[in-house]
């Protein structure tokens, strides 16, 4: 039998990290078992579901590279199918019409609460014949009253729930629309889902859904209920912890590989290994290895992984992701070095692509002024002679090469009988406007000969004005 999993988000907001991790685990389980992965949009909450949220979820999945084999399916386009199954269940006697008013239900629950009893529907309409009336009604599933539901969860082990604790679940509302718990069951059956991976907040729904599947004569999938993600204060991760949608991580400069690597480790492990390629995840991932305890989100760890991937991935690939940030920061890269070369030069220090883009601006644009601290320290009177001499030697280079630039700087230091830093630091500030950059010869090479000439002249003028002031 082909392994088939699904990710079934509700389009009421962005794709958050918890949902992304669930999608990743489900996707990995399918890929690890040469199976299929289905994307399904559970949009039955018509009032809260929006096209914008749906688009954000699809965009997030695509950016992460979690490709799907089927879908996206939309529940709102399957109402005819749900109604067909409900009609069958009414005819078979596994569902019934409930005419109890909202007021009666509320009174019943208040009385149960006052007695310390479990609050659930009392079955008033369960065995009554349907009425020939225009009274409003809901449709309820006739849950078994004896026995129990037993299932083996990949994460939590064996779970058993007595049927007398379960309600007669509403499967169709008064206006006729099917409910979430019912739609999920029909979808999983129709789509041949063999394993359901989802958050632990759904675990109470599972025995109810299993009973509906049994009533339909449908196969029961495997289940894996994943623990929640916590903030650093031990509370459930939320917006107040800075929890954001997946695409915000793109906007903040994270690579999809870094976020996927971080999310897979947020509850799953393989020995002490921290860094996993996508291929390694596919080979090693097992649902049974997921930790049942909640995991705490750690931004520092994510930053460490992101820096690792910026340094280790192919610069051409990283440059493709960097393009978005350059455009976002309005940096025109048409007149300057190849972005891949900039990635190679700056990758050692950048934690995010957003930082990398910001620190690369001087390769493409002239700066208005020198950093005050760097200028105060390095563009002093003693810098005049090294700057003038190195400018002359650089201008004499017939070819603009790393070797030639390095030799010009070294010859200047030798001729003036000073250390390389006495030439290199003023030169760095002159060309970049700041006190930090990659190796000064590489920096000059990427900035280009003409720009270097102009900027060194500007620095010499700055030093002269400082001497004369």
Curated annotation (Swiss-Prot):
The keyword Cytoplasm applies. A motif ('KMSKS' region) lies at residues 236-240. GO terms for biological process: glutamyl-tRNA aminoacylation. A motif ('HIGH' region) lies at residues 9-19. The keyword Ribonucleoprotein does not apply. Its cofactor is Zn(2+). It is found in: Cytoplasm. Pfam families: Anticodon_2 (PF19269), tRNA-synt_1c (PF00749). Binds 1 zinc ion per subunit. HAMAP family: Glu_tRNA_synth_type1. Monomer. Belongs to the class-I aminoacyl-tRNA synthetase family. Glutamate--tRNA ligase type 1 subfamily. Catalyzes the attachment of glutamate to tRNA(Glu) in a two-step reaction: glutamate is first activated by ATP to form Glu-AMP and then transferred to the acceptor end of tRNA(Glu). This is Glutamate--tRNA ligase. The gene is gltX.
